[in-house]
Design a protein with these regions (language model features):
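Active-site mouth of glycoside hydrolases
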Residues: 31, 35-257, 262-271
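Bacterial lipoprotein signal-peptidase II cleavage site
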Residues: 22-27
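Low-complexity, flexible helical/coil segments
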Residues: 77-79, 87-96, 158-161, 200, ...
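C-terminal motif of bacterial Sec signal peptides marking the signal peptidase cleavage site
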Residues: 17-20
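Extended, alpha-helix-rich binding/interface surfaces that flank or overlap catalytic cores
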Residues: 330, 337-339, 344-416
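Extracellular glycoside hydrolase catalytic/binding regions
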Residues: 33-36, 195-345, 350-367
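Bacterial N-terminal signal peptides that target proteins for export
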Residues: 1-8
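Hydrophobic helical h-region of N-terminal Sec-dependent signal peptides
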Residues: 9-14
Length: 416
């Protein structure tokens, strides 16, 4: 993480970093009728039929979260990387992250998702993948575009739509572990962070403006956690920051839909006052727990009806198969498409489960141990050979061929 004193210098250097991310266009120019469009509360495919989103999230692949590794205290990408570096050193950690990105999601995973009846995948990603900032073992040669290019190709082969979701925005948009931030949504108070957010989205949109596989761009995930005393003040800034991102994208891309999530875990849509500032926007909500009934989401339905635009449940899950089946029925009855969270993680509550490798419990123990001083790190650190083997065994365990297919979970989603 670079600390620069002057805003102008910061932006200049960040621009240089972005310039190194690649210039290749994903496809040749296509006409606007090749893309999914909006008609009232419906999404319409190029052939004129309705698209009802059903699918999953590729969570943890490009935005690691602690609980998917069975870590609790070590819960953000930054914390996980720091812990691994303390455990096995920075060079081995960098090698681990490359192997992780190469194997956690592959062409075979995308084919499997399609075979389960899905039509859409949501890709959560970290903004750092498109900068020169240290992230997942890389610095100046970040691989965000290479990873997305591969996923676009795999989705095209499997006839799946792709939503690009900036899960971790510059400065942090949530203020919690899920945005890998410093505990506050600084994005809304920082012009520098907002400029970087716009610059990254402009470059992403310029690269994929002619790619019909991409359904849309989700500007950021779950803005403004409910913990902050100035929550309402932050909520008042939300729509304006969204508008800045939309404007940046529209400089280069008029084809794609843009998705806007509500405040407070994508559940509060009161901050939105203007649904007409762009003719290709839709809204996205999230929900975990509660009753699987229409009454439980009536406020979301009411907002959707008031703006007469599509609403989509971008995240939902971590419940019983019976609950999920009932709620999927509720969403289908109310024309709210869905992508369940996540596709893959340790144990269950996902399409496929990763079996913890031998001695993984020792890594979990280290992740939870006090590590505030060098003495504490030394005292808590398990044997190097064992730790390194457990991490490499995790890479094998996360491959689709070695995962446990959660048949009941998949059936509960009603995608076939």
């Amino acid at each position: 993480m670079k600390h620069l004193l002057a805003t102008s210098i910061t932006i200049a250097l960040l621009s240089l970093g972005l310039a190194g991310c690649g210039e290749k266009q994903a496809t040749k120019e296509v006409t606007s009728d090749a893309f999914v469009t909006i008609q009232g509360q419906d999404l319409i495919k190029p052939d004129g039929t309705k698209l009802f989103i059903m699918g999953t999230n590729l969570g943890n692949w490009l935005n690691p979260e602690g609980y998917m590794f069975k870590f609790s205290k070590t819960n953000s990408g930054r914390f996980i990387n720091e812990m691994f570096c303390q455990l096995v050193g920075p060079d081995f950690t960098a090698d681990f992250w490359k192997a992780f990105k190469d194997n956690y999601v592959t062409r075979e995973d995308i084919r499997f998702i399609k075979e389960q009846g899905a039509n859409t995948i949501r890709l959560p990603f970290h903004y750092k993948l498109f900068t020169d900032e240290d992230y997942m073992g890389l610095t100046a040669a970040q691989d965000g575009f290479a990873r997305v290019d591969s996923l676009v190709e795999w989705c095209r082969e499997s006839d799946l739509y792709l939503i690009l979701d900036m899960h971790d925005a510059p400065g942090g948009q949530t203020g919690d572990n899920i945005d890998d931030s410093y505990g506050y949504p600084w994005l809304f108070d920082s012009e520098v962070s907002q400029q970087l957010y716009c610059d990254i989205w402009r470059r992403i949109a310029d690269r994929y403006k002619n790619e019909p596989v991409i359904l849309g761009y989700e500007l950021f995930n779950e803005p403004i956690a409910p913990y902050f005393e100035n929550m309402e003040e932050l909520n008042g800034k939300l729509e304006d920051v969204y508008k800045k991102g939309v404007a940046a994208i529209r400089e280069v891309d008029s084809n794609h839909i843009i998705l806007l999530g509500g405040a407070q875990w994508n559940g509060n849509f009161k901050p939105f006052k203007d649904s007409k500032f762009d003719d290709k926007i839709m809204y996205t909500c999230h929900r975990y727990g509660g009753e699987p009934t229409q009454a439980a989401i009536q406020t979301i339905i009411n907002f959707r009806d008031s703006v007469n635009l599509p609403m989509y449940m971008g995240e939902i899950g971590h419940n019983t198969d019976e609950w999920q089946a009932a709620f999927c029925q509720t969403m289908r009855e109310n024309n709210i498409g869905y992508t369940f969270w996540p596709y893959k993680k340790m144990d269950g509550s996902s399409f496929v489960g990763i079996t913890p490798p031998e001695n993984w419990a020792n890594i979990v123990y280290f992740s939870e141990a006090p590590r505030a001083t060098y003495k504490e790190i030394r005292e808590a650190r398990p044997a190097q050979a064992m730790s390194r083997k457990a991490m490499m065994d995790f890479i094998e365990a996360c491959k689709l061929k070695n995962c446990v297919v959660q048949e009941g979970y998949i059936r509960s989603l009603g995608m076939k």
